[in-house]
Curated annotation (Swiss-Prot):
<dbReference type="GO" id="GO:0043814">
    <property type="term" value="F:phospholactate guanylyltransferase activity"/>
</dbReference>
<dbReference type="InterPro" id="IPR029044">
    <property type="entry name" value="Nucleotide-diphossugar_trans"/>
</dbReference>
<keyword id="KW-0342">GTP-binding</keyword>
<dbReference type="GO" id="GO:0005525">
    <property type="term" value="F:GTP binding"/>
</dbReference>
<dbReference type="InterPro" id="IPR002835">
    <property type="entry name" value="CofC"/>
</dbReference>
<protein>
    <recommendedName>
        <fullName>2-phospho-L-lactate guanylyltransferase</fullName>
        <ecNumber>2.7.7.68</ecNumber>
    </recommendedName>
</protein>
<dbReference type="Pfam" id="PF01983">
    <property type="entry name" value="CofC"/>
</dbReference>
<comment type="subunit">
    <text>Homodimer.</text>
</comment>
<dbReference type="GO" id="GO:0052645">
    <property type="term" value="P:F420-0 metabolic process"/>
</dbReference>
<keyword id="KW-0547">Nucleotide-binding</keyword>
<comment type="pathway">
    <text>Cofactor biosynthesis; coenzyme F420 biosynthesis.</text>
</comment>
<comment type="similarity">
    <text>Belongs to the CofC family.</text>
</comment>
<keyword id="KW-0808">Transferase</keyword>
<keyword id="KW-0548">Nucleotidyltransferase</keyword>
<comment type="function">
    <text>Guanylyltransferase that catalyzes the activation of (2S)-2-phospholactate (2-PL) as (2S)-lactyl-2-diphospho-5'-guanosine, via the condensation of 2-PL with GTP. It is involved in the biosynthesis of coenzyme F420, a hydride carrier cofactor.</text>
</comment>
Length: 236
């Protein structure tokens, strides 16, 4: 299986701009990417990063952000292949699907809670000529496995519904994978709560995930107000 991780290297996570500066958003995005790559490599697959611009995993992430599991067949985790495609997400991913000679998994780089177990379930899902999708909140498509040669993605709007309709049109069996961890992407400030709550459960070594650690380094902590859990930032 060819596992692809799209990554917006130039201006990541703009919807977090009200709580993070551009350099901070870049640092958080790199930490999430490293967590996702670690989870994928722990399943025994070698991921390919589909980046909008040239990206060095060794220079673009701190040493602490590099995946801890060495992918099979690679000398080090920093040797994970990077393919540059500056086209919009839909066009870039469809180019990967068109060129594929084996099943393709597309896993978004902001799935900070992804674990090897959750990904293994996704990778094993779907019919031999079908599609398996882990939907996100609000109708998005957070991860999918494509085994049908004619299936193409369209990430605009409620893409999960569009992908279901497209699969039906081409006669591809579709399986929806119900996963809290793959259904949680980090786009909005409110999403940071889940990272701080579940970050320790995500890390394979029993410590805290790189993403949660980076948030704490930036001064974010959980705060309970009127019975609701939110995040607050200490800038001192």
């Amino acid at each position: 299986m060819h596992v692809v991780v799209p990554f917006a290297a130039d201006t990541p996570k703009t919807r977090l701009s009200e709580v993070l500066s551009p350099p901070e958003r870049t640092a958080l995005a790199r930490a999430m990417l490293a967590d996702v790559l670690s989870a994928i490599t722990a399943t025994g697959h070698v991921p390919t990063v589909l980046s909008t611009s040239p990206l060095s995993l060794e220079n673009g992430c701190s040493c602490d952000d590099l995946p801890s599991t060495t992918p099979p067949g690679l000398e080090s985790a920093s040797d994970i292949p990077v393919t540059v495609d500056d086209r919009p997400l839909t066009a870039a991913v469809n180019a990967q699907l068109e060129a594929a000679e084996e099943p393709v998994a597309i896993v978004m780089a902001d799935l900070a809670l992804a674990t090897p177990a959750a990904l293994s379930t996704l990778f094993a899902s779907g019919a031999a000529d079908g599609v398996a999708i882990a939907p996100g909140r609000g109708g998005g498509t957070n991860a999918l496995v494509v085994r049908h040669p004619d299936f193409r993605v369209d990430y605009h709007g409620a893409s999960y519904l569009d992908h279901r309709e497209h699969a039906a049109e081409i006669g591809a069996p579709l399986e929806s994978v119900d996963s809290f961890r793959l259904g949680t992407d980090v786009d909005e400030p409110a999403d940071l709560v889940e990272v701080l709550i579940h970050g320790r459960e995500t890390a394979a070594d029993g410590g805290e995930s790189r993403t949660a650690t980076r948030l704490r380094e930036l001064g974010f902590e959980l705060e309970t107000t009127d019975g609701r859990v939110t995040v607050a930032r200490d800038r001192s």
